[in-house]
Regions:
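Flavin-dependent oxidoreductases
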Residues: 172-175, 185-214, 254
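Conserved N-terminal helical subregion
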Residues: 3-5, 74-172, 180-185, 240
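N-terminal FAD cofactor-binding segment of flavoenzymes
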Residues: 46-86
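Conserved Rossmann-like nucleotide-cofactor binding loop
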Residues: 16, 39, 166
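Glycine-rich FAD pyrophosphate-binding loop
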Residues: 25-50
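Conserved FAD/dinucleotide-binding core of flavoprotein oxidoreductases
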Residues: 206-255
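Rossmann-fold NAD(P)-dependent oxidoreductase module
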Residues: 23, 116, 120, 190
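N-terminal Rossmann-like FAD-binding beta1-loop-alpha1 element of flavoenzymes
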Residues: 6-33
Length: 255
């Protein structure tokens, strides 16, 4: 059986895997992505409340490879960061003007990142073996051979495991992982507010865990609410009005 050969094979076509693949493709590397899901599903992604912070350094990389242009319309600049311990009126204050001309970073909806990456993959002709899981990986001194569930096989000088925290590639490579569980749950949502957030990100370290308010486009904020498991389970089941009351007790009335 003839095997396709590449410089880099990236297993996992999520945000990390596709971003790396497009960057490597831009510098002339022969790259293939192996993804058990579908690019069409990524291209049809809708807002699920989650956003990602893009640092100034990451923005430079994305800009250099032409990815920042299509992302920028949905990117909200972070101009200030305010960090407080509990309900203390005192806070640490970071201002972009103290560090340089540009923002401290940006918040971008995950759904928009996924759609943009899927579109750029098709536009640039990046090879993606989709809708097929990896069945085996064979590691040699100078290359790796990857077998797919549908009988295909590829070889690459380098394999990148971008298939998540329960990485099958990591396990196939015999790389151990140490993990533990915190008795906490992350509740993520987005809110619209009347007062402009002015590009300010807030983070409060409460006894139950961090509570973050991150600026988004269209005068919205992404909420990352960490809560104890037993209480979080009750919060998630609340109706919208009662949930809003619980959120307001932590959010406050400044927005």
């Amino acid at each position: 059986m003839n095997k396709e050969r590449f410089d880099v094979a990236i297993i996992g076509g999520g945000i990390v895997g596709l971003s790396l693949a497009l960057n490597l493709l831009g510098v002339g590397a022969r790259v293939v992505v192996i993804e058990r899901g579908s690019l069409d599903d990524m291209a049809a992604a809708t807002f699920d409340g989650r956003g990602s912070a893009v640092s100034a350094g990451s923005q430079l990389i994305l800009n250099g490879t032409g990815l920042w242009g299509p992302l920028s319309a949905s990117a909200e600049p972070i101009l200030e960061i305010r960090v407080a311990d509990g309900t203390s009126p005192l806070f640490l204050h970071y201002d972009h003007r103290d560090l340089g001309k540009g923002p401290l970073g940006w918040i971008v909806e995950n759904a928009h990142i996924r759609r943009t990456l899927a579109q750029e993959v098709k536009k640039r002709g990046l090879p993606v073996l989709e809708k097929v899981p990896l069945s085996a990986a064979h590691f040699y001194p100078s290359y790796v051979s990857l077998d797919l569930d549908d009988g295909r096989s590829v070889e690459a000088r380098l394999a990148v495991a971008a298939d998540g925290r329960h990485s099958a590639v990591r396990e196939m490579a015999g790389i151990d992982a140490v993990s533990w569980s915190y008795p906490q749950t992350g509740i993520v949502c987005a809110v619209e507010h009347e007062v402009s957030h002015q590009g300010v990100a807030h983070e409060h370290f409460l006894s139950s865990g961090p509570f973050a308010i991150l600026p988004m486009t269209k005068n919205r904020s992404s909420i990352v609410w960490t809560e104890r498991n037993e209480f979080a389970a009750k919060i998630i089941k609340l109706d919208d009005a009662t949930f809003a009351e619980e959120l307001h007790s932590r959010f406050g009335s400044f927005l």
